[in-house]
Amino acid sequence: MSDRVYLTRDGYNRLKDELHELLHVTRAEVLEKIAEARSHGDLSENAEYDAAREQQSQTEARIADLESKLSSATILDPKHIKTDKVYILTSVELLNLDDKKETLEYTLVSSEESDSDLGKISVRSPVGRALIGKAVGDKVTIIVPKGELHYEVKKIFVK
């Protein structure tokens, strides 16, 4: 049985669109590549055939992964997210306790929707794990590969 996957409606739709593309476009393209490579004769030393088979394997694995995630997905409605503590889909403003001038803002999302460029971090990341369950005023020590980071939760909200 798969772990429950928590997604926004947009995140769910993105995964669904990717699955549709893989099933109806990519899969057919890969099968064409395999057929073309087969037509070149001896498969034992056919790098084109090997590459196409590898692409097929990766495509089928991604299809299986997406089907599993979508079948176990729970779509979260931001309107029903509490802001008394840091939960998935909450945004949090942090004050850097080592440099009182620096503030950071993150939105906690599932690993399927994380995008550090947009400030969306996974609840499974070191930062996400450290923040889950914290309330405004709580101090947080986050252990990252570069060492320890010290923050205070200043604000919790939903975008």
UniProtKB/Swiss-Prot annotation:
GO terms, molecular function: DNA binding; RNA polymerase binding
UniProt KW Transcription keyword: yes
UniProt keyword terms in alphabetical order: Coiled coil, DNA-binding, Transcription, Transcription regulation
Biological processes per GO annotation: DNA-templated transcription elongation; regulation of DNA-templated transcription elongation
Chain coiled-coil ranges: 44-75
InterPro entries listed in its UniProt record: GreA/GreB_C_sf, TF_GreA/GreB_CS, Tscrpt_elong_fac_GreA, Tscrpt_elong_fac_GreA/B, Tscrpt_elong_fac_GreA/B_C, Tscrpt_elong_fac_GreA/B_fam, Tscrpt_elong_fac_GreA/B_N, Tscrpt_elong_fac_GreA/B_N_sf
Stored Pfam families: GreA_GreB, GreA_GreB_N
Keyword Signal: no
Family membership: Belongs to the GreA/GreB family.
Entries under PANTHER family matching the protein: TRANSCRIPTION ELONGATION FACTOR GREA
HAMAP family to which the protein is assigned, alphabetical: GreA_GreB (MF_00105)
Summary of the function given for this chain in its UniProt record: Necessary for efficient RNA polymerase transcription elongation past template-encoded arresting sites. The arresting sites in DNA have the property of trapping a certain fraction of elongating RNA polymerases that pass through, resulting in locked ternary complexes. Cleavage of the nascent transcript by cleavage factors such as GreA or GreB allows the resumption of elongation from the new 3'terminus. GreA releases sequences of 2 to 3 nucleotides.
The protein's name in its UniProt record: Transcription elongation factor GreA
Species of origin: Chlorobium phaeovibrioides (strain DSM 265 / 1930) (Prosthecochloris vibrioformis (strain DSM 265))
Phylogenetic classification of the source organism: Bacteria, Pseudomonadati, Chlorobiota, Chlorobiia, Chlorobiales
Gene this protein is translated from: greA
